[in-house]
């Protein structure tokens, strides 16, 4: 890539926006040049970035407010905008070619395309999208074509499930399957019981309940892996942990396989083509052991179980914040390289 850093901007400085910024600032192939958030002042942005209840205090460069429109990470200036309408954010002024759309609001293609009017060349939506093409790194990123300007990084759960499902389907064939994600609290939930008109259960106190919830993550696997379209569905339990989630994938296999054979295949893939995306562990781990893990999916060999050679339950962990944010940056690099060719 000739040492030229890819310039990125972030729209929305929430959980994912801030962590994408943390990932970007620790890498030497991308450069954060701008952040837009109309709801946070520059000094508050600094505080929210520096102190993080889950991932700890920022220790890499000193962070200062230069003025109301500029943050300094060490000596490096990052321009701050506070614009509500994405069409009006002047990304072009800062040289930001790639914009991470992490507000959770502009998730469809037309709304995300507003960033192109401000000078961005490509937009990466950090959420599933109903009409923008979804790419899961390690699964279908090779299908990206340079004429696509708006892409979705899917969801954190799809990023955990899809690599595992791909490995199993490629080697043994999946007849059908059900997924459950035991998922940490996210920002949409309530600290105490409150109104949530579309999802009554979701309005109950997050820190006090196990809350059944819907998720499109399993069905979305069918979009990134067409061979599995219509073969997977799933649901979620929201539980009172602040980060790290775990997927339970229960599948019926076409080809007979012992649990030992399945483990061996996943281990081989985790050390081969999917290294850095799919992990493998035989340790006696629990959820907090994965805080800050940048892989999409870490298969827990000891937690899974087989009923017989055609019916198995597979368990895979993911840091739903950090792993996902790491993939956002990876996807930017993939899009950039395809666009250069």
Curated annotation (Swiss-Prot):
PROSITE patterns: GAPDH. D-glyceraldehyde 3-phosphate binds at residues 155-157, 186, 215-216, 238. The keyword Cytoplasm applies. It catalyses: D-glyceraldehyde 3-phosphate + phosphate + NAD(+) = (2R)-3-phospho-glyceroyl phosphate + NADH + H(+). It comes from the Eukaryota. The active site is at 156 (nucleophile). InterPro entries: GlycerAld/Erythrose_P_DH, GlycerAld_3-P_DH_AS, GlycerAld_3-P_DH_cat, GlycerAld_3-P_DH_NAD(P)-bd, Glyceraldehyde-3-P_DH_1, NAD(P)-bd_dom_sf. Plants contain two types of GAPDH: cytosolic forms which participate in glycolysis and chloroplast forms which participate in photosynthesis. All the forms are encoded by distinct genes. Homotetramer. This is Glyceraldehyde-3-phosphate dehydrogenase, cytosolic.
């Amino acid at each position: 890539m000739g040492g030229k850093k890819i310039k990125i901007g972030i729209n929305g400085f929430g959980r994912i926006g801030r962590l994408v910024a943390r990932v970007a600032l620790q890498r030497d192939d991308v450069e954060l040049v701008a952040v837009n958030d109309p709801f946070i002042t520059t000094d508050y942005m600094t505080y929210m970035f520096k102190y993080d209840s889950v991932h700890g205090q920022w220790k890499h460069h000193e962070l200062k407010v230069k003025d109301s429109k500029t943050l300094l990470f060490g000596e490096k200036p990052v321009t701050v905008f506070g614009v509500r309408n994405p069409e009006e954010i002047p990304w072009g002024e800062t040289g930001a070619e790639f914009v991470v759309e992490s507000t959770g609001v502009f998730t469809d293609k037309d709304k995300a395309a507003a960033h192109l009017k401000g000078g961005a060349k490509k937009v990466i939506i950090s959420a599933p999208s109903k009409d923008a093409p979804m790419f899961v790194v390690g699964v279908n990123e090779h299908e990206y074509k340079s004429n696509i300007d708006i892409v979705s990084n899917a969801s954190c759960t799809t990023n955990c499930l899809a690599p595992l499902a791909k490995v199993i389907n490629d080697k043994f064939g999946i007849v059908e399957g059900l997924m459950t994600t035991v998922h940490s609290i996210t920002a949409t939930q309530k600290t105490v019981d409150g109104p949530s008109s579309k999802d009554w259960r979701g309005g109950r106190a997050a820190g006090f309940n196990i809350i059944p919830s819907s998720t499109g993550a399993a069905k979305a696997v069918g979009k990134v892996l067409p061979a599995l379209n219509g073969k997977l569905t799933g649901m979620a339990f929201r539980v009172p942990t602040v980060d790290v989630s775990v997927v339970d994938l229960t599948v019926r296999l076409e080809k007979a396989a012992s649990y030992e054979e399945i483990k061996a295949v996943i281990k081989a893939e985790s050390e081969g083509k999917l290294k850095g995306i799919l992990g493998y562990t035989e340790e006696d781990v629990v959820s907090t052991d994965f805080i800050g893990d940048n892989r999409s999916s870490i298969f827990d060999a000891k937690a899974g179980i087989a009923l017989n050679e055609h019916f198995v339950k597979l368990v895979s962990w993911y840091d739903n914040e950090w792993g996902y944010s790491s993939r956002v940056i990876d996807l930017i690099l993939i899009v950039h390289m395809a666009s250069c060719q």
